Amino acid sequence: MSTVGTPQAITVRYSIDAKRSTFTVRAFATGMLSAFAHNPTIAIPDFQGEVSLNPDAVEQSSLRMVIHAASLTVTDDISEKDRREINRKMHEEVLETDSFPDIEYECSRVSGSKIADGQYLVALNGDLTLHAVTRIQSVSARARLNGDMLRATGDFPVRLSDYEIRPITAAGGTIKLKDELKLSFDISARKQE
């Protein structure tokens, strides 16, 4: 059987543009005094990565992303003193950023379907390395191609205990963070030349 004249699917590489993207973590308080605590929103401003996308064969696509853990910062409307203290605890006691500076996600197991011209629903099953522990992390996203730009949106849960991380506690343990965090993203990536 001849393949002459058959169009070949082309994989296109995109570089993630952190400045045009948003990536956040929501943590939720629990415990006897949790009604008096707040549920912090944490911005992830410093990350980079690359997407390889084959629009005609999504399963041949891949993603690699590196987050600089020390860049995570609380964005809530709280006092500067509280912000510094929460950020310090997050970096020193939870993420231990001096020992584990990067959070990495690498995925080459992608499935999905085209839902409209240039729009896809995708499911990624990749390796998330956090706090020197690697686990399979599933992420569902809606991806859209627009000229030289790729945009992906979605959210997914991460359990701290899966990565051997103890949640922060306060007020003698009567307030602590729940084990499960919610990560939300609106990632833009530009086609590489």
Task: Identify the role of each PLM range.
Residues M1-E193:
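Low-complexity, acidic/polar, glycine-enriched regions of mature
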